[in-house]
Amino acid sequence: MLTKLKNYFLKKNPIFYVDSESIFEEVLKEISGEKILGVDTEFDWRNTYYPNLCLIQISTKKKIFLIDCLRLDSLFKLNLIFENEDIVKVFHSVRSDVTVLFNSLNTKVSNSFDIQIAEKFLSSGDLKSYAKIVLKYLNLNIDKSETNSNWLKRPITESQINYAANDVRFLIKIYLQQKKILERKNSFLAVKNLIKKEIDLGSQELFIPRLKKMKHRKKIEKDLFMWRENIAKERNVPPSYLFKDKNFKKILKIYDENTLREKIYDILQNEKLANNLIESLK
C-alpha cells in the first residue's frame, strides 16, 4: 500500500517513496492512466562509462513518486510509460535525462516536452536553469543545494527528498502555461520538433556524438578512439581512466613514427593494455 512520507504533504503534492516491487507495481498502474507526467532523474556518472541511475522522479498533477532505482530489479517496466505516445512526459533539459534513461533502461522516450527548450524559444535567449523558469512562471524560489549530492548513498536524506521532489513538482504547471502561449503563437509544433531533435541526440550510444566529431580525422585516429571506447565499456570506466586525451596524441605520434613499442608501454603503464592497443592498430 502506498504510504505518504511524513511531513512532505502539507499544502503540497504528497510524496511517495517507491522502494519495493509491490509498491512499484501500484505506481505503474496509477501513472499509466495519466495524460501528463513530470519526469526527472538523479544519477552518478563520475567513475563509470555508463551512468548509474539512482532515482527517477515522476509527478502527476496531484502526486510525486520518488522511485529508488537502487532497490528495484524491474525498472524496465517503466519503458511502457516512457514509450507511450499517449502520455506527455515533461522534462527540464531533456537530453541529459533521456541519455541516462536510454543507456540505463534501453528506452527511447516518446511524446516529450522540455520546458527549457520551450523557454529559450519563447524568450529568444539562452538556456535557463530550472530555478529561473520556476521563478518566472510561478514566482517561487527553490533550493538547489543538493545539485552535487551523492545519490548513491542510502538512506536518502530529508534535504535530498525535498530537492528531488521539487525537481518535478512544478513541471506540469509550467508546461501547461508554456503550451498555451506557444499555441497562441502557432509555435507549439515547432518547439516539439526542436525537442525531438534533442531526444534523438540523447537516445544513442555514448560514443556516437564524439565519433561524429572525428569524421575528418585519419582512420588510425578513429581506430584508436574506438579501441579506447570499447575497453572503457568492457570495464565500465571513463575512457580517460585508460589514458587521457593528451596521451591520445602522443600514442598516435609514436605509432606514426614507428617508434619502439616500449614507449607506448611507458605512456599506458600497462603492458597488457599496450599489447592490446598495438594489435588493434595493425
Role assignments for model-derived ranges:
Residues 37-42, 114, 167:
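Short acidic catalytic loops
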Residues 38, 88-94:
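Acidic beta-strand-to-loop metal/phosphate-binding motif
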Residues 142-200:
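Acidic, Mg2+-coordinating catalytic module of metal-dependent nucleases/exonucleases
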Residues 64, 84-89:
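Short active-site oxyanion
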Residues 1-37, 41:
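N-terminal accessory regions of nucleic-acid-interacting proteins
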Residues 47-62:
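A short alpha/beta connector and helix-capping loop motif
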Residues 57-61, 96-153:
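Metal-dependent phosphoesterase core characteristic of DEDDh/y 3'-5' exonuclease domains
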Residues 182-282:
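Acidic catalytic cores of enzymes that act on phosphate-bearing nucleotides/polynucleotides
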